[in-house]
């Protein structure tokens, strides 16, 4: 049976179909048939509401089994880690992969929906491997955000790619390599 991955999209009009679908296609190509990537369209992608995305993620979590890999891009990664910190899922995640995720709180972005968190290490499911990725040429989320997450998650693996943008130039080969390392 194929190993499960859920990919949580970023926000913005048409992001699911026009932008993050390219990341998913790259990930599927790099990982091959041994992995099955779920790519749900999140509600109100052009103006995400935390409560609505949270409810959607919790529903998606019910479909996942122990060892499933969680991947979030941009605000999808931000919401994913906040949901995990608030309400650990019933399954045991095999890994958490955040790509160009905005950090909410001091030094990062403000939010009316999400609490500032500095306690991710204590709140995430115990032992979950965490990987943080960011393109150094990201013109949407400053690279400083990945370092804020790194401070909140000292056990995380951090990868910053020179010359790559918010979409990591639609190249998920490094993410796929790290996912395969968990097997």
Placement of each model-derived feature along the sequence:
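Short, surface-exposed "cap/lid" segments of acyl-processing enzymes
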Residues: 2-46
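Acidic catalytic loop of the alpha/beta-hydrolase fold
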Residues: 14, 136-141, 166
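Short alpha-helix in the alpha/beta-hydrolase fold that links the catalytic acid
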Residues: 20, 142-151
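Catalytic histidine-centered segment of alpha/beta-hydrolase-like enzymes
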Residues: 48, 164-176
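Catalytic active-site module of serine/aspartate enzymes centered on a nucleophile-bearing elbow/loop
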Residues: 60-63, 171-183
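Gly/Ala-rich beta-loop-alpha elbow adjacent to hydrolase catalytic centers
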Residues: 71-81
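A conserved short beta-strand
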Residues: 90-104
């Amino acid at each position: 049976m194929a190993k499960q991955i859920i990919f949580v999209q970023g926000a913005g009009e048409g992001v699911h179909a026009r932008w993050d679908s390219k990341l998913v296609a790259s990930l599927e190509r790099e990982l091959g048939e041994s992995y099955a990537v779920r790519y749900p369209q999140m509600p109100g992608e052009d103006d995400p509401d935390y409560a609505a995305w949270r409810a959607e993620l919790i529903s998606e979590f019910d479909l996942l089994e122990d060892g499933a890999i969680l991947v979030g891009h941009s605000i999808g990664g931000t919401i994913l880690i906040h949901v995990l910190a608030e309400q650990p899922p019933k399954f045991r995640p095999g890994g958490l992969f955040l790509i160009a995720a905005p950090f909410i709180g001091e030094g990062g972005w403000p939010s009316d929906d999400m609490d500032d968190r500095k306690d991710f290490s204590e709140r995430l499911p115990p032992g979950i491997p965490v990987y943080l990725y960011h393109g150094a040429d990201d013109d949407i989320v400053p690279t400083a955000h990945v370092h804020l997450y790194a401070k909140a998650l000292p056990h995380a693996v951090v990868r910053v790619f020179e010359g790559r943008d918010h979409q990591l130039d639609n190249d998920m080969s490094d993410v796929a390599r790290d996912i395969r390392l968990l097997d």
